[in-house]
Amino acid sequence: FEDHSPVTRELFLGMALNNFNLTLSPQAIAVGSLTWFGFNSAVSDNSPSYPELYAALPNDVGAEQFDVYNTSSDIGRLGRGVDAIDAGGVNFVLEATIEINNNLRRQPAVGVFGAAGIGVGELSVTGTLSTYFDNDEILQVILNNEETTLDLITQGGDGRSMVFDMPRIKFSGGAPDVPGKNQDVTIPGTYQAILSPTFGYTISTQNVSFAR
């Protein structure tokens, strides 16, 4: 906390990533959030060496700065099955989300301040896919309980890209939403990603430094 005098530092120990959420809404900034679990934390304002926190003061490295992704011009692909969802000029996406949950749990113990350990649970990948209802293609997939795929590529103007691939998903819900006169009919679908025996993963994520 550099606005403090002396500067205060807080150190979080044994951190593990529990949740990652990504939301794509139309004509907006792509929004992501992270949730972490840890053993405990410590705080000190004993500048400059902070002996309560470190055996040796670490080197501070500034985070790299990049332009944020927007959902208008930075979406390289949003696909279901072989083709992009809107390949036929129909069923454009209103909103898409990915929610990854590692189902971690803090393990308390007598005589331990904080957590004695972090328990690892089963990976869960869910999300939503809301599209315009221009034909019955997605509705048939939902009604027939068919397996399909979902993939997303964000691509910035500088070539930086992120790839999210779910080779096996099933929709757990979704029905045409008819809001009223002079309004668009949509399908707000919810899905669950499943482990693919072919590829050996439920979801794959990749960062690409440059792509065109």
Write out the residue ranges for each language-model feature.
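Signature of extracytoplasmic/envelope-associated structural regions
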Residues: F1-R212
